[in-house]
Amino acid sequence: MALRLGQLGSGPWWRAVRGDYAQLRAPSPRSASACVCRLPGTAGTQPRRGLGHGSSAGGGSRLGTGLAAALAGMAGLAAAVLGHVQRAEMVPKSSGARSPSPGRLEEDGDELARRCSTFMSSPVTELRELGRRPDDMKTKMELMIMETQAQVCRALAQVDGVADFSVDRWERKEGGGGITCVLQDGRVFEKAGVNISVVHGNLSEEAANQMRSRGKALKKKDGKLPFTAMGISSVIHPKNPYAPTMHFNYRYFEVEEADGKMHWWFGGGCDLTPTYLNREDAVHFHRTLKEACDQHGPDIYPKFKKWCDDYFFIAHRGERRGIGGIFFDDLDSPSKEEAFRFVKTCAEAVVPSYVPIVKKHCDDSYTPQDKLWQQLRRGRYVEFNLVYDRGTKFGLFTPGSRIESILMSLPLTARWEYMHSPPENSKEAEILEVLRHPKDWVH
């Protein structure tokens, strides 16, 4: 099923938000997993099948119980529960500081329909439910990540010009589901995945114990801890060795105690992994993220930049995965609305921070030696994701997890050579120096 974004307005879910809810039906497993969304400017291209397309793609993820099941499809959400090694904080800005507008979601059904018409798929939550609670943070976050997914996919498809994003919609029997969009074997991108997950249920005992170990002594009701988790996660691997890989992830989590007390927090980040160092690109990427952070306080970028450098560290290699960006977790201050506005601002910075860099380098000439070095660096990327990334490890060791979406972050190709070491003063050695000793790119 090939769709243009502009044609989504004729679908049944579009009619539903205008009041005809009886016509709203969940897509069949086959049609959902086979969907290919063609974006403006890509007419006439051949549809390509993405990851997660198979017998288990559309019929539910068959997940286990608790949080492990809930994470099905976005490993980054596991880090939101199990990876709180630090607590992110934002201090309220002075009254003289510029404050972004709240961006309140309009309750009018036509406005919601107009906004949803640009998405890659209908939202995971029923539109009637979203319309009933426009001011709820779960609604705001779900619509924001759906919007971000569409914006990123549209921008990447326009850059590639050949390949389409497959749209793989999956459901979770315990509650919620997700939308995995993958473009692979394109002209510019070897593999680009943009995944959304919106899940809810009860925390597993393991997850509850992890929270208690971090000082969150949550009280169960009848042995259960209800939770909601949602987020967007993306990894983009271009073909050209001079175009860097980029990753971003933004998520929201709620847990309700027995007495009705609600705990909530945000997490996420955005980072760049170049094969070869281009200082102009590094400055552009970090400056764009800094400008986004600075809208919410002058001390945020330095703190989250260091956190990123520390987190994406391959200890057995003594290297960072890339040149960093920002990373934060357990963000629950100064208020839910301000924290959301910060996350939204960061999500809006994804396209302007990265797409100009890809456009600049996607047609650069390169040698077989350049490609070889790219494959070796991709090997490092795989090592970090499989050995250190908390969300990936948790998902892989959890029975019933949706493996296709968890491994979406891995490149199509990578390489390992025994005792490989680049020559001194080479451009390969230059990037290694930066990976071993992180730099300040904006001062």
UniProtKB/Swiss-Prot annotation:
<dbReference type="GO" id="GO:0006782">
    <property type="term" value="P:protoporphyrinogen IX biosynthetic process"/>
</dbReference>
<dbReference type="GO" id="GO:0016020">
    <property type="term" value="C:membrane"/>
</dbReference>
<feature type="region of interest" description="Important for dimerization">
    <location>
        <begin position="381"/>
        <end position="417"/>
    </location>
</feature>
<dbReference type="InterPro" id="IPR001260">
    <property type="entry name" value="Coprogen_oxidase_aer"/>
</dbReference>
<feature type="transit peptide" description="Mitochondrion">
    <location>
        <begin position="1"/>
        <end position="98"/>
    </location>
</feature>
<dbReference type="GO" id="GO:0005829">
    <property type="term" value="C:cytosol"/>
</dbReference>
<feature type="active site" description="Proton donor">
    <location>
        <position position="247"/>
    </location>
</feature>
<keyword id="KW-0560">Oxidoreductase</keyword>
<dbReference type="GO" id="GO:0010288">
    <property type="term" value="P:response to lead ion"/>
</dbReference>
<dbReference type="GO" id="GO:0006784">
    <property type="term" value="P:heme A biosynthetic process"/>
</dbReference>
<feature type="region of interest" description="Disordered">
    <location>
        <begin position="90"/>
        <end position="111"/>
    </location>
</feature>
<dbReference type="GO" id="GO:0042803">
    <property type="term" value="F:protein homodimerization activity"/>
</dbReference>
<dbReference type="GO" id="GO:0017085">
    <property type="term" value="P:response to insecticide"/>
</dbReference>
<feature type="modified residue" description="Phosphoserine">
    <location>
        <position position="101"/>
    </location>
</feature>
<keyword id="KW-0597">Phosphoprotein</keyword>
<keyword id="KW-0809">Transit peptide</keyword>
<comment type="function">
    <text>Involved in the heme biosynthesis. Catalyzes the aerobic oxidative decarboxylation of propionate groups of rings A and B of coproporphyrinogen-III to yield the vinyl groups in protoporphyrinogen-IX.</text>
</comment>
<dbReference type="GO" id="GO:0004109">
    <property type="term" value="F:coproporphyrinogen oxidase activity"/>
</dbReference>
<feature type="binding site">
    <location>
        <position position="233"/>
    </location>
    <ligand>
        <name>coproporphyrinogen III</name>
    </ligand>
</feature>
<keyword id="KW-0627">Porphyrin biosynthesis</keyword>
<keyword id="KW-0496">Mitochondrion</keyword>
<dbReference type="GO" id="GO:0005739">
    <property type="term" value="C:mitochondrion"/>
</dbReference>
<feature type="binding site">
    <location>
        <begin position="400"/>
        <end position="402"/>
    </location>
    <ligand>
        <name>coproporphyrinogen III</name>
    </ligand>
</feature>
<keyword id="KW-0007">Acetylation</keyword>
<comment type="similarity">
    <text>Belongs to the aerobic coproporphyrinogen-III oxidase family.</text>
</comment>
<protein>
    <recommendedName>
        <fullName>Oxygen-dependent coproporphyrinogen-III oxidase, mitochondrial</fullName>
        <ecNumber>1.3.3.3</ecNumber>
    </recommendedName>
</protein>
<dbReference type="GO" id="GO:0048034">
    <property type="term" value="P:heme O biosynthetic process"/>
</dbReference>
<feature type="modified residue" description="N6-acetyllysine; alternate">
    <location>
        <position position="393"/>
    </location>
</feature>
<dbReference type="GO" id="GO:0010039">
    <property type="term" value="P:response to iron ion"/>
</dbReference>
<feature type="site" description="Important for dimerization">
    <location>
        <position position="316"/>
    </location>
</feature>
<feature type="binding site">
    <location>
        <begin position="249"/>
        <end position="251"/>
    </location>
    <ligand>
        <name>coproporphyrinogen III</name>
    </ligand>
</feature>
<dbReference type="GO" id="GO:0051597">
    <property type="term" value="P:response to methylmercury"/>
</dbReference>
<comment type="subunit">
    <text>Homodimer.</text>
</comment>
<dbReference type="GO" id="GO:0006783">
    <property type="term" value="P:heme biosynthetic process"/>
</dbReference>
<dbReference type="Pfam" id="PF01218">
    <property type="entry name" value="Coprogen_oxidas"/>
</dbReference>
<dbReference type="GO" id="GO:0006785">
    <property type="term" value="P:heme B biosynthetic process"/>
</dbReference>
<dbReference type="GO" id="GO:0005743">
    <property type="term" value="C:mitochondrial inner membrane"/>
</dbReference>
<dbReference type="GO" id="GO:0005212">
    <property type="term" value="F:structural constituent of eye lens"/>
</dbReference>
<comment type="pathway">
    <text>Porphyrin-containing compound metabolism; protoporphyrin-IX biosynthesis; protoporphyrinogen-IX from coproporphyrinogen-III (O2 route): step 1/1.</text>
</comment>
<keyword id="KW-0350">Heme biosynthesis</keyword>
<feature type="region of interest" description="Important for dimerization">
    <location>
        <begin position="182"/>
        <end position="191"/>
    </location>
</feature>
<dbReference type="InterPro" id="IPR036406">
    <property type="entry name" value="Coprogen_oxidase_aer_sf"/>
</dbReference>
